[in-house]
């Protein structure tokens, strides 16, 4: 991914598109995240949390309708749409391909951005994609039992933690995998609230 140039927007202002548009995160010159230079792509934590809130609302409505009315059409459709949305984020981040990510970015467009590392967010989106895809496959195959509901409730819990509390559980897991030397990214994760702070990997020193 190319590094930022003087033509890139200021990190002090929110913007709808990353540069280049098909990158998961944005690169900036002279940006620091939690006291260290951000030599890695970043995303706007506020937009991520807003998007998580939208997904949480959709998932909650779908599961409630399935549970109380025994109508599984909404959960079948929403699970497919959410899985597709998270898949698109793996390609181009929150914008412009992800409809929910774009909506989340739009909702916080007038707020000062809070930049965090994109790598661990991509890991979190991959986990959410896997869960949504599993729900989509099972519900569209006619499986609507307790197991599917538990997967859905777990996903809602993770989204609630992200959007309401501001704690990304998957990002924390990602940082623990680094600490256990199970994965070796070039940069240590920079999470919201500095909640997954660890020493920079040897490759980045």
Question: What feature does the model see in each segment?
Answer:
Residues 2-3, 8-205:
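Membrane-interfacial helix-loop segments of redox and metal-homeostasis proteins
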């Amino acid at each position: 991914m190319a590094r930022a140039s003087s033509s890139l927007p200021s990190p002090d202002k929110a913007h709808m598109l990353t540069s280049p548009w098909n990158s998961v995160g944005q690169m900036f010159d002279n940006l620091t995240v939690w006291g260290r230079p951000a030599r890695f792509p970043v995303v706007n934590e506020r937009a991520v949390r807003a998007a998580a809130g939208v997904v949480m609302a959709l998932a909650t409505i779908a599961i409630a309708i399935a549970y109380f009315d025994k109508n599984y059409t909404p959960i079948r459709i929403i699970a497919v749409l959410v899985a597709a949305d998270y898949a698109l984020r793996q390609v181009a981040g929150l914008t412009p391909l992800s409809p929910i990510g774009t909506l989340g970015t739009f909702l916080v467009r007038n707020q000062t951005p809070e930049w965090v590392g994109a790598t661990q967010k991509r890991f979190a989106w991959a986990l959410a994609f896997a869960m949504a895809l599993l729900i989509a496959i099972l519900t569209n195959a006619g499986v609507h039992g307790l197991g599917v509901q538990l997967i859905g409730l777990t996903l809602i819990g993770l989204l609630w933690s992200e959007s309401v509390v501001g704690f990304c559980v998957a990002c924390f897991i990602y940082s623990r995998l680094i600490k256990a030397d199970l994965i070796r990214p070039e940069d240590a994760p920079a999470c919201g609230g500095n909640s997954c702070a660890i020493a920079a990997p040897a490759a980045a020193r």
